[in-house]
Design a protein with these regions (language model features):
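Catalytic-core signal marking the mid-to-C-terminal active-site face
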Residues: 2, 6-18, 254-356
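N-terminal glycine-rich anion-binding loops that anchor highly charged ligand groups
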Residues: 8-14, 28-54, 68-79, 268-271, ...
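Active-site cofactor/substrate anionic-group-binding motifs, chiefly glycine-
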Residues: 51-105
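A generic, well-ordered mixed alpha/beta core segment in the N-terminal half of proteins
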Residues: 83-174
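Glycine-rich phosphate/pyrophosphate-binding loops
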Residues: 138-150, 248-262
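Phosphate/diphosphate-binding glycine-rich loops and adjacent basic-rich segments that engage nucleotide
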Residues: 151-221
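Small-residue-enriched flexible segments
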Residues: 190-255, 269
Length: 356
């Protein structure tokens, strides 16, 4: 089926095709273009709308400017029995982190657990996509990254010195959806702010503040110079700091004042850092028993007493529901984003979404 502008729905295959075609046009090899398209589409399918095709114009701009390498030589170095460091050669973060996940799974098969860092990587999109990669090997996955720009202050601070450095963990289940927690360390992700700006939706009054006055900012068009607040106050700021040190500093990637703003400085190399952890649950008990226990707890918790008019949700429930719906029905893309993607398709000489 083709995109239906009346319904506002775009088939997943059309989105994937647009991403892949644009990557090919800027010199990305076919196999890499397919991998990038797969991972970007997965972000859209699971509901991480600010990390899928929404990012395509930015990625294309960086590839054109040369601040992202379209043909990186990604290498794995400093490998030990349970650790490794992936050097991304300034390639697309999707390629670098997926290589890190593959390496972590391979090492964890031998050692039971592996931690793999990334340096000279780039923006990779939704954290939950990468934490979930070890699920395919029946392993627990964890992921964190240094965010693509600093928008958040330390506790009591008035300077944006921290990114929204995300963390995700994915735990395999049997018949139930896997448990997947994917969180920014800010009260909301900055991608959410950008989505609100794109759709002209007011911000919640506890999301951003004016750095001069401390007053709430609710106009999404005034967000560029506002401070994004950490989740749970100093706790969220502390998590952002520690994840930044582990994903950035530990790997020789950038963190803190050194970070390059992915959005405002498109011509500069970001040297983004990430890490992936893979853990084999069969080293602790029989795999099927563990997955059955995850199922049992999931059902018990999901069926617990809910507040009036609400239902109990577990991390990963909405993700699984959205994914099934969007595969079946297509993706709902904002009108402004459709305009941007149509303009990009025209510039790149590829089919627009509605033509696919």
């Amino acid at each position: 089926m083709k995109a239906d502008p009346r319904e506002g729905l775009v088939p997943a295959a059309a989105v994937r095709g647009l991403i892949e075609d644009c990557m090919l046009k800027v010199g990305v090899p076919a196999q890499d273009a397919a991998k990038i398209a797969e991972l970007m589409l997965e972000a859209d399918l699971i509901g991480a709308d600010a990390h899928g095709v929404f990012r395509l114009p930015q990625y294309v701009q960086r590839l054109k400017l040369g601040s992202t390498n379209p043909r990186p030589n990604i290498t794995v170095g400093q490998s030990a029995p349970a650790t490794a460091l992936v050097h991304g050669d300034n390639g697309m973060g999707h390629l670098v982190v997926s290589r890190a996940a593959e390496t972590a799974i391979e090492l964890a098969r031998e050692c039971g657990v592996a931690w793999v860092g990334c340096a000279m990587s780039g923006h990779a999109g939704a954290a939950g996509v990468y934490a979930a990669l070890p699920l395919k090997a029946n392993m627990i996955g964890m992921y964190s990254a240094v965010a693509n720009a600093n928008h958040m202050p330390l506790a009591g601070g008035a300077e944006p010195l921290l990114g929204t450095n995300p963390f995700a963990i994915a735990i395999p289940a049997g018949e139930e959806p896997p448990v997947v927690l994917d969180i920014a360390t800010s009260i909301v992700s900055y991608g959410t702010i950008k989505n609100h700006r794109l759709q002209n939706i007011p911000l919640h009054d506890d999301w951003m503040i004016d750095p001069q006055t401390g007053e709430a900012i609710t106009d999404p068009h005034q967000s560029a110079h506002a401070l994004l607040l950490p989740m749970a106050g100093y706790k969220g700021a502390g998590l952002a700091l520690t994840f930044g040190l582990l994903a950035g500093t530990l790997n020789g990637a950038l963190f803190g004042r050194d970070c390059v703003d992915f959005n405002a400085e498109p011509d500069r190399v970001t040297n983004t850092g990430q890490f992936v952890v893979a853990l084999d649950p069969s080293r602790f008990q029989k795999l099927e028993h563990f997955k059955a226990e995850v199922d049992r707890h999931s059902r018990s918790l999901r069926n617990s007493k809910a507040l009036p008019g609400q239902s109990v949700r577990l991390p990963g429930d909405q993700r699984a529901k959205r994914r099934a719906e969007r595969i079946a029905n297509g993706l709902s893309l904002p009108a402004e984003l459709m305009k941007q993607l149509d303009a990009l398709a025209g510039d790149m000489g590829v089919k627009e979404l509605r033509e696919r």
